[in-house]
Amino acid sequence: MEDSSTDTEKEEEEEKDEKDQEPIYAIVPTINIQDERFVDLSETPAFIFLHELHAMGKLPGTRMAALKAKYTLLHDAVMSTQESEVQLLQNAKRFTEQIQQQQFHLQQADNFPEAFSTEVSKMREQLLKYQNEYNAVKEREFHNQYRLNSLKEEKIIIVKEFEKITKPGEMEKKMKILRESTEELRKEIMQKKLEIKNLREDLASKQKQLLKEQKELEELLGHQVVLKDEVAHHQTIPVQIGKEIEKITRKKVEMEKKKIVLEQEVKTLNDSLKKVENKVSAIVDEKENVIKEVEGKRALLEIKEREHNQLVKLLELARENEATSLTERGILDLNLRNSLIDKQNYHDELSRKQREKERDFRNLRKMELLLKVSWDALRQTQALHQRLLLEMEAIPKDDSTLSERRRELHKEVEVAKRNLAQQKIISEMESKLVEQQLAEENKLLKEQENMKELVVNLLRMTQIKIDEKEQKSKDFLKAQQKYTNIVKEMKAKDLEIRIHKKKKCEIYRRLREFAKLYDTIRNERNKFVNLLHKAHQKVNEIKERHKMSLNELEILRNSAVSQERKLQNSMLKHANNVTIRESMQNDVRKIVSKLQEMKEKKEAQLNNIDRLANTITMIEEEMVQLRKRYEKAVQHRNESGVQLIEREEEICIFYEKINIQEKMKLNGEIEIHLLEEKIQFLKMKIAEKQRQICVTQKLLPAKRSLDADLAVLQIQFSQCTDRIKDLEKQFVKPDGENRARFLPGKDLTEKEMIQKLDKLELQLAKKEEKLLEKDFIYEQVSRLTDRLCSKTQGCKQDTLLLAKKMNGYQRRIKNATEKMMALVAELSMKQALTIELQKEVREKEDFIFTCNSRIEKGLPLNKEIEKEWLKVLRDEEMHALAIAEKSQEFLEADNRQLPNGVYTTAEQRPNAYIPEADATLPLPKPYGALAPFKPSEPGANMRHIRKPVIKPVEI
């Protein structure tokens, strides 16, 4: 049992996978459609039914012929559709075989080894490449040809429009001609209006006459149809009478044969009655014993049924418990798997945290070592610093002594100068030497001052360079720290990404497991629902069987009671058997005839039921075909609606163009166009009225012929009525010879009459008993049929509800699939976006890695990076300048204050102009005092004056 259940579950899962893969379509109702190509129309139920209706007089011959013609047309249409379906199926089979072959060849080509390169493969690659190039060239050529054709068509349209544009002289001539024609047309229109009024009055009178004649004609046609139906009915009466005569003769022969058989049976019955009397006593005893046994068996049966119902309930409870335990087991398995996976994840996280902890400990030790080394280096540098300070203090400071020494020397020099000036005896040569020495001394002093300034500047520059170097080293250290932090963050982010990817995979896996579990639960639920339905059906069937058995028991009891009565009656009949033999024979004959009539009626009703069933199947097939046609029509309507919308859009565009062109026309042309339209409309009305007049004139000769036929038919009808009246008078005439017919034989005496009345009363009592029995059987059968009808109606409602539910579920499934497809599309888009972002991240990582490697090597960054950075700076500067300029423009536009303090909204006048000379640059020059007039060229006297040469300023 478990193996079979697992197999069925696997099969159901495979079927569901196939259903999920396959697209959802509307389910066509399953109907066994027969092949109409091999059907004989004369043997169809529709033709037979029509013939029967015609024979019964319910359907006229003309209507029957019209219905037959319609049925043959429909049959031909069905045959053509079936042939087309067969052809399409053959084509589909052929095409599927071709597709399978092509797919097989493609698979062989795909499975061909890639590494195996031969000359044939190279040639094939070249051929494919050239074929692709050739196809691309063909497509380009087709597009170019299409564009060329469209441009040619546009050119032709433009040329036609240009030709249509009339010249002003021609327009005036046309206007004059059109005005003259409009005046003439107005006069004609006035005349036509008068004529139309007269014609309308005539037409109104003719229409009234025509309506009266049409009413009379309709009455005559209706009377004619009635007469035709009566004629057809009267024609079928002799045929029916002949058939009835044949049936009566056959029945007469059969009854004579049966009479002989019944006489023999009566003899045998007299012998068997004696035996039956002996058997009846034994049967009564057996009957009592059987009734007792039946009651005992019935009690046992009820007990067994109760036990069976209890066992069925226990079985259903066990199945439900099994299903719940299976679902709980599946849920526990899922929870166990998830817990194991969570355990594994926690273990991985713990190991990762331990690794990170160990790595942090190592880094901490390294940092401690580096700190120790840096402390030692700091102590050494502090010792060096103190030593250098001591050395600096030990160096003597000669700045003050040198300055004092220099001042003393200056004083001595000045004293010497004074002494030399006071000495008058010194010669000229000595004075020159003294001057030279003084000049040299001044030069040396100036050089000394310059050198001092240079020394001071150099000291400042060295200090600045040292500060810059320290700043750069600090920046370098900060950049290194940032880089290390970024690398750590990147690694942490990579780890987080991996963790999230793992979680995502686990979530997807859990979702799949939940989906599988949901599918299994849904399958089990469907199974239980089906089992419940089957159980309900079985219970209902058992109840129906129980009720049927009870009804049968009641019928058997009633039949037993009736048999007891019959036995009593038979005992009475046996006493009076000799006297009542002749009456019994007559009764038997009548009963046999009635039974035959009942059998014939039953056969006729069965035939009618079969015909109706066939007609129902045919109608259902027609409904299916009509539904298909309706669906095709709806599709065609939707397509035509889409095309109509497109055409309407194109028409709207064309209408817009036409409106633009019509606006360019003159008002006179519009009025003329309106007048022409009115004239055309009036002409159309006149033509329509003339057509109506012609139709009425054509109908008049047909009316005369119909009047003549009607008069002939009325004469015939009056003759028929006169003939019928004469026949009735002859039949009712009291003085006729055949009016009365005396019965032969002797009159009965009173005793004989009393005896005959007693016999008739006995016969009447028997007939009443039989009628009561038949009424009872009829009531029982009618009860059963009513129950069956109510059940069938209830089943119809159930089927309708089920169909509605199925349609609702199909709609839900369709909506769910559409939503799933949309979500899948969104997911694919998101996946593509994530892939692109991952690519960008990788590129950025590579870029950062290259930058870091260059920084570590001590190389400068790429020139492209520098250019991009400069571009960014330049863009920022440009953006700031543009914002400032815009703000200034807005302020100027708001203020617009003139030099004299007056505010104005007028635009400023130009203060400069660009010269037209080719040699000079196009730089703006001021107008001068007489703006906006350009300054005049210098005169002839100004040409010979030289402009002063401005000397450069020496600093």
From Swiss-Prot:
Region (Disordered): 1-22
Subcellular location: Cytoplasm, Cytoskeleton, Microtubule organizing center, Centrosome, Centriole; Cytoplasm, Cytoskeleton, Flagellum axoneme; Cytoplasm, Cytoskeleton, Cilium basal body; Midbody
Chief location: cytoplasm
Chain coiled-coil ranges: 114-141, 169-321, 400-461, 534-640, 667-832
Protein name per its UniProtKB record: Coiled-coil domain-containing protein 146
Ranges of biased composition (kind: Acidic residues): 1-17
GO term, biological process aspect, one: gene expression
General function of this protein: Essential for sperm flagellum biogenesis and male fertility.
Alphabetical keyword list: Cell projection, Cilium, Coiled coil, Cytoplasm, Cytoskeleton, Differentiation, Disease variant, Flagellum, Spermatogenesis
Entry comment describing in which tissues the protein is expressed: Widely expressed.
Disease: Spermatogenic failure 94: An autosomal recessive, male infertility disorder characterized by reduced progressive sperm motility and multiple morphologic abnormalities of the flagella, including irregularly shaped, short, absent, coiled, and multiple tails.
GO molecular function per UniProt: protein-containing complex binding
Assembly with partners or alone: Interacts with CCDC38 and CCDC42. Interacts with intraflagellar transport proteins IFT20 and IFT88. (Microbial infection) Interacts with Chlamydia trachomatis incM/YT288. In host cells infected with C.trachomatis incM, CCDC146 is recruited to the periphery of the pathogen-containing vacuole but recruitment is not dependent on incM.
A Gene Ontology term for the protein's cellular component: centriole
